[in-house]
Amino acid sequence: MDATLRALNRFGLGARQGERQRIRDSRSWLRGQLDGGAPTIAAPAGVTPESIGDALRAVRMAGQGDEQQRRDARRRVVEMGASEVHNTLSVRATTDRPFVERLVAFWSNHLCVSTGAKVLVAPLAGSYERDVIRPHVLGRFEDMVLASAKHPAMLFYLDNFQSVGPSSRGAQAGQRGNGQRRGLNENYARELLELHTLGVNGGYTQQDVQELAKILTGWTVNGIGGQAARAMRSAQPRRRARGSA
């Protein structure tokens, strides 16, 4: 295998027709892939923050309706998710910067949200890759992680949108029907430490998970589709995890 084909396979997405012949020097080609920021891509036709919000509200409202309403609402969400997948595949099949697209795919997998796990995540996954992964793929990791933590797709996927500081005003005001207060959800904090950053052998403790979860309380979703921070849900006072505020 010659150097050009090796570079296209290892660092890109394989050779498109004629691409191998156009590349004269594989090292220069690879360096050129990193020139400029990551290419931006547009959302599929008809997929807007408003249409996503409408579709997700329909899913929630359909829970109180009949079976046909639920099927119709879920079908719209699935269709939006499918159009996002087609959009992404089209970009990767035609891009002139396959190394960047490979990096986008890598980081989308590392900081993944599952479209099959929760119906609320499916129509948001495309926006997550466009607005979280792509803008930071050639930048700082911490900026990407912070953007990931605040995006509605991640807030829904790992339940941080409903995490409430146990002694917060939000917990006191929002008791469940059985009289129990809404409380702390550790799902995202654990994932952030175990998979996204430090790793399973990263030296953190269960107390670190709990303190990080408290720091992250109040990061929620404004209606459906927008990130918001709500102080009344936050754990008080401010906590520390592994010595850092």
Task: Please report, for each region that a protein language model flagged, where it lies by residue.
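Structural motif
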Residues: 1-3, 94-99, 183, 203-206
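Flexible, low-complexity segments enriched for small/polar residues
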Residues: 5-21
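Short alpha-helix boundary/capping elements
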Residues: 12-13, 38, 111, 115, ...
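N-terminal accessory alpha/beta regions
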Residues: 17-136, 161, 167-176
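Active-site substrate-binding loop specific to GH73 endo-beta-N-acetylglucosaminidase modules
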Residues: 121-245
